Structure formats: C-alpha cells, structure tokens
Amino acid sequence: MSIERKLAAIMFTDIAGYTESMSKSESKSLDTLEKKRSILKPLLKEYKGTFVKEIGDGTLSYFESAVNAATCAVKLQEATYDDKDMNIRVGIHIGDIVFKDGDVFGVV
C-alpha cells in the first residue's frame, strides 16, 4: 500500500484565552468562535488553503504555497486585530504531510 505524501505549509490557529473565556460566558465565546470561522473560511478560499479540521477553537489547514499560508495568517490577524475577544495565534510549519481518512499527518 503506497502512502500519498505532499509537501505543504500547515497552518494552525487558535484563540488565546478561549478556555478561560468559555468559563466566563459560553454564549459570548461561541459567538467569537463563529466570527473567527466567518473571517477564516473566505481567507482560506482566497489564498488557496484547504480546511482540514477544527478542534475546539483551533483549526488546521494546509496550503501548497508557503507565501499563501503566511499571507492568509497575516490577513487573519489584521482582520481580527481590533477585536479584544479574538486574540488569534497562528503557527505555520512546512513539511511532508500524509493524507488518511480526510485528515493529514506528518512531522511538520
């Protein structure tokens, strides 16, 4: 069985302080999460990113271009900069990924 590998830029995002925020106001925190989604999804499309999954307030996406990943990350942070409830953290790594069951794996 062959494994499909692909060189990609992986982008992780999360909202700093989200767990603490949930303990204070679930409704407000869920609204913040929905706002993040509404900003991120069009940016992924614009910069040719592929959304893989969401775990709580974190997301995992990948890009074929490191430049597109970095630009998307900057645009996400610019779009949320003035929102005190949405302190977005972004990590980008580059390396080979493996696809399995709609998910990606790798040491990136």
Please annotate each region the language model reported.
Residues 1-72, 79:
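Catalytic NTP-binding/metal-coordinating core of nucleotidyl cyclase/transferase enzymes
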Residues 86-100:
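A short glycine-enriched loop-to-beta-strand structural element that forms part of the catalytic core
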Residues 100-108:
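Catalytic-core segments of nucleotide cyclases and related cyclic-nucleotide turnover enzymes
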